[in-house]
Amino acid sequence: MTKRTFGGTSRKRKRVSGFRVRMRSHTGRRVIKSRRQKGRERIAV
């Protein structure tokens, strides 16, 4: 069987793709906007 290689670090995940990081840049805000329009339950991590 294959190993589960993805560990997942919550601090790193927040720093890369958290809400506050998204709001910093123009493109990040565009991501938030499009996810809101689509009706995503989770806008950001």
UniProtKB/Swiss-Prot annotation:
Residues 10-39 have a biased composition (Basic residues). Disulfide bonds: none annotated. Keywords: Ribonucleoprotein, Ribosomal protein. Coiled coil: none annotated. Residues 1-45 are annotated as: Disordered. Gene3D superfamilies: 1.10.287.3980. GO terms for biological process: translation. Pfam families: Ribosomal_L34. InterPro entries: Ribosomal_bL34, Ribosomal_bL34_CS. One of its GO terms (cellular component) is ribosome. GO terms for molecular function: structural constituent of ribosome. It comes from the Bacteria. Belongs to the bacterial ribosomal protein bL34 family. This is Large ribosomal subunit protein bL34. It comes from Prochlorococcus marinus (strain MIT 9301).
